[in-house]
Structure formats: structure tokens, C-alpha cells
Regions:
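Conserved ABC ATPase "signature" region
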Residues: 63-64, 111-129
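Conserved ABC ATPase signature
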Residues: 134-138, 142
Length: 248
């Protein structure tokens, strides 16, 4: 289980996370929604230990990432996979080497075993036979799939997704959402997804949490969020400019 308890983070006078509390259920997908620039990516960086909170705890299976040193963080990150917003592939490496990268960095597996794992992970995202291609030869959707294959390389029990459908057309976005949903169901991983794509959020989430003014103001099942009476959440979900959220 992942739990953020009373987490604060400020940059100068701007408080981005304001005594935030959030529990992410084990083996489920939680999608975090909220306005652009509202702190969702900052929250995600805390979940993987790339940022330390000014106050509060970031608990992963009861261990506080905020109190870990670099060696401890490196060890616990082996249980994480992350799909970055732009897939973050190494342009100088072919697809196979991109997927193999965490295996070479964090394990002592033999070359043949790594090759087999790479092909297995690529097949699991529908990309068999592309190991020798370069990232520049791939479409945006294919790059996202390769990024997911790399995120799965170490069989993580926690997978983080940063805007996984940004920049994709609606058909490809739906395909990526389906892949995320199926991957979670197959692996049983705990997934945290940062997203503006409300249609995708309602499709893949077990729970949806809304971040607003530095706090999680609502969390519930897709149906609970869709039918909420909270005026802030309702305005955001309905995509209306008029309401308590000021649009400037």
C-alpha cells in the first residue's frame, strides 16, 4: 500500500502540496486528476523518492521514503516501474536496449536471459519483433508501449504513469488505456496514474482522486466521482469554465 500523510511541499512562497493525505489501495489503479500546474507531477515525484517533502510521510509498504538515504531509495525503486509522459526512451539505443536497460543496471542476469525477458515484455504490450528498431522509427503510441515494456522489465509491484495518453489521438489514447487496464489486471500491480484524460480515467481506475489547491479534495470510485455533489469536482469533471474553479 502507498500512503501520503500530511505531505507539504513548497517552492519559495508557492505551496504546491498543502498537508496532503492520500491512500492508494494495493493491487488497484488510482488515477489522480486536477488542473495543469496543480502539483500532480510533484506528487508523483514524491512517490518515487525524487523529491522529499517539507513535512509529512510518504509510505510504501510501511517504509517512509522521506527518511531514506540514496542507497535505500535505489533499492526500493527496484519495485517500481514508471512510464514517463514522453516515454523518455534513449534515442541512441534501439528498442531492445531501451527495454533491457533496467535489467542491465539492476540485475546480474545473463545476456540470453535478458534478451528473452525483453522479447516477453515487448510481446506483452503488442510489439513483438521490434527490438532492432530505433525510437525515431516509432509512432507516438509505439513509443509509449516501449516505455511500458521497459517499466515492466523488473516485474514491479508498483507502476507509475505520468500523463500516459498525452499527445495521442483519441483512438491511440483508448488503446493505451486498454493496455494499462489489462496490464494491471494481469500483473496485479498497484498503479498510480496522473492524467487529464477523464474518459481514460473513468475507464481504467478503481479509484479517482482529485488534487486541488494542494490537497486531495475527493476520492472515490468512478461512479462516485461522476455523481459527486462537490461543486469543484463536478465543474472539473464536466469541463465547465464557470464555477468555483477560477479559469484565468
Amino acid at each position: 500500500m502507498i500512503e501520503l500523510v500530511d505531505v507539504c511541499k513548497a517552492f519559495g512562497r508557492q505551496r504546491v502540496l498543502n498537508h496532503l493525505d492520500l491512500a492508494v489501495e494495493k493491487g488497484e489503479t488510482t488515477v489522480i486528476i486536477g488542473r495543469s500546474g496543480g502539483g500532480k507531477s510533484v506528487l508523483l515525484r514524491h512517490l518515487i523518492g525524487l523529491m522529499k517533502p517539507d513535512c509529512g510521510q510518504v509510505l510504501v509498504d510501511g517504509q517512509d521514503l522521506a527518511r531514506m538515504n540514496n542507497r535505500q531509495l535505489k533499492e526500493i525503486r527496484k519495485s517500481f516501474g514508471m512510464l514517463f509522459q514522453d516515454a523518455a526512451l534513449f534515442d541512441s539505443m534501439n528498442v531492445g536496449d531501451n527495454v533491457a536497460f533496467p535489467l542491465r543496471e539492476h540485475t546480474r542476469k545473463r545476456r540470453a536471459e535478458i534478451r528473452d525477458i525483453v522479447e516477453e515484455k515487448l510481446a506483452s504490450v503488442g510489439l513483438s519483433g521490434v527490438s532492432d528498431k530505433m525510437p525515431s522509427e516509432l509512432s507516438g503510441g509505439m513509443r509509449k508501449r516501449v516505455g511500458l515494456a521497459r517499466a515492466l522489465a523488473l516485474d514491479p509491484h508498483i507502476i507509475l504513469f505520468d500523463e500516459p495518453t498525452t499527445g495521442l489521438d483519441p483512438l491511440m489514447a483508448d488503446a493505451i488505456d486498454t493496455l494499462i487496464r489489462d496490464t494491471q489486471a494481469r500483473t496485479g500491480a498497484t498503479c498510480v496514474v496522473i492524467s487529464h484524460d477523464l474518459a481514460g480515467a473513468f475507464k481504467i481506475a478503481h479509484h479517482i482522486a482529485m488534487l486541488y489547491e494542494g490537497r486531495i479534495i475527493a476520492k472515490g470510485t468512478p461512479d462516485e466521482i461522476r455523481n459527486t455533489e462537490d461543486p469543484v469536482v463536478r465543474q472539473f469533471v464536466e469541463g465547465r469554465a464557470d464555477g468555483p474553479i477560477k479559469v484565468v
